[in-house]
Amino acid sequence: MATKIRILPENLTNKIAAGEVVERPASVAKELVENALDAGSKEVVVEIESGGRRLIKVSDTGCGMSRDDALLALERHATSKIATDEDLFSLCTLGFRGEALPSVASVSRLTISTRTSDSVEGTEIYAEGGRIKEVKECGMAVGTVISVRNLFFNTPARLKFMKSAETEGGHVGELLTRLAISRPEVRFTYKNDGKVMFRALDADLKERVATMLGRSISSFLYPVSYQEGGLKVSGLVAAPECSRSAGSHLYTYINGRFIKDKVVQHAILQAYRNFLERGRYPVVAVFIDIAPGEVDVNVHPTKHEVRFREQGRVHDAIQKAVESVLKETPWLKRSAVAAASRPAEKGGGALRPFSSMEASQAALPVTPQPRPALTPGHPDPPPQAQLQQPLVSESRVAEVRELLVNFQPRPQPPLRPQYRGSVAPREGSPYAPIAAAPVPASEPQSAAQDSDHVAAGYFSSLGVIGQFNASYILCQRGTDLILIDQHAAHERVAFEKLKGQFAGREVDSQGLLFPETMEFSFRESAVLREHQAELARLGFEFEEFGGNTWLLKGVPQVLSATRYVDTIRDILEELGSLSRSRAFSDIQEDLLARIACHSVVRGKRTLSPVEIAALFKQMDETDFSSNCPHGRPVMQTLTLAEVEKMFKRI
């Protein structure tokens, strides 16, 4: 009887093994760059073509390999990094399994060129599909150059799952970002289709993080340094205002190895729990140094997950380290120093909002200020330098200029009576109203509307009582008390408006008078480059400025008066999560809802009767007005019976 179990041929086992190690071009780059760092390289250059499908080339200045070692490196489970099973628990290198090169070679056309310092000439090896085809001598500098061409040429099924060149190039860039942050003393260069995407010179950690994640974040980074027994926690943490909508900027390392460990991430999030809203994630680069025997890194093919011997101790140490920095709120001190450095201005006092009307009136004096007359007590005129000093400080001029540039007059309805009359409060009454009672929105608003006999909608028919906590509008309809969340209501109106514009062609965009320069991380920049057309439909107009710097030339009209930078970063996070099974069309409403949410005032705001009436009119013209785009209710109703029950009247 023939056996059903058979030994698989070597070429098939190699492809199966390669499937665990080589998932995409970024996986190849990871293995090769980690080998370069283990070899002591002080400079690493990574070049790709067609997203890595055509070429992945890694050049380093490490120790190189002899001819015999280079040939052995292509054999499975051949490595110089471990020799016994005890070595698995004292690892000081990034690689140790001896699988990388043979796995990559089995699914590509691979060339290795390498030379050691004690060799006159180097060795070049060419392998195709895991089989060595040619070995020869070559001239080169000390180090190693590995070229991987035609990745997955012999595994077409795997080739089908590769994404666009832009996406794959973005994954390679993100991989290099992680490695570059872990080794700030090593120079990194990344080229994509001949174009230099970034070049990171050797520097300290703060400079390296700023290079990789954007200069705008550098002034919001604060050092962490904590030691407890044999456990050391160091690195940088960012202020809460730099937070992201996903955990893509949590750069955590164990003994120099990038990891995505739940214990480590939970400790960091716990430290930030009192500083961030739910669903927001901090920007950190945290390094944990621990005895190799206290952590097992050999628990996952990608080595991104680890297992600690004393999990609770590590968790608590990380949380304490980050909390020790955050509890000092250094970003507030920075703001105070910046405020103190500005010259004091006349009439200064408690901070107050600077209204648009004030901005329009804040012009420089037309006539010069009168100079003091010369008197016997002041025989000499003021020095010439003093006469040439500006009448208004430069910071004040810049502030006014910015307000005038961003000033947009709020559209006002036609003038009309807004109150039936006013009832003077009784003398000495503690319940004096803020303003006279407004006319219910259901009342006729003009003679033109009276002649048209326009029937008021549900919201416009409500009798407005007032506002509670500058966040909720209290209304009455019959004997019912109705509470309306003004933020949720405004958000629904903005969302439906955006959805209508997007269905037509694109969201109305507001051009910026002065384009804003924005620096992104490599991952964000790659996502932006790939989805630039979709972002244009959403109202964001970008122009590439070089490297990871972009010019923002237009934003959706609804965002023009808000902080749109955070909105853009959140949208890029959302777009970065797209996969083959999740297209842009699947998340377009989520993105519109995010824009709508960021476009409305989140905090407390006192509304005038005119603004309330305008909001209610828009709500009557809006579909699904009972809920905001995130599903939260816009209104709640309390019947008279429920109110009387509260006071035990029934």
From Swiss-Prot:
GO biological process, one term: mismatch repair
Alphabetical list of PROSITE patterns matching this protein: DNA_MISMATCH_REPAIR_1
GO cellular component: mismatch repair complex
InterPro entries registered for this protein in UniProt: DNA_mismatch_repair_CS, DNA_mismatch_repair_MutL, DNA_mismatch_S5_2-like, HATPase_C_sf, MutL/Mlh/PMS, MutL/Mlh/Pms-like, MutL_C, MutL_C_dimsub
Biased composition (Pro residues): 367-384
Region (Disordered): 358-392, 408-448
MF annotations from Gene Ontology: ATP binding; ATP hydrolysis activity; ATP-dependent DNA damage sensor activity; mismatched DNA binding
Keyword Cell membrane: no
Keyword Phosphoprotein among UniProt keywords: no
Pfam families per the UniProt record, alphabetical: DNA_mis_repair, HATPase_c_3, MutL_C
Biased composition (Low complexity): 430-444
Key words of the record: DNA damage, DNA repair
Family stated for the protein in its record: Belongs to the DNA mismatch repair MutL/HexB family.
NCBIfam families, per the entry: mutl
PANTHER family: DNA MISMATCH REPAIR PROTEIN MLH, PMS, MUTL, DNA MISMATCH REPAIR PROTEIN MLH1
Known function: This protein is involved in the repair of mismatches in DNA. It is required for dam-dependent methyl-directed DNA mismatch repair. May act as a 'molecular matchmaker', a protein that promotes the formation of a stable complex between two or more DNA-binding proteins in an ATP-dependent manner without itself being part of a final effector complex.
Protein name: DNA mismatch repair protein MutL
Protein species of origin: Geobacter sp. (strain M21)
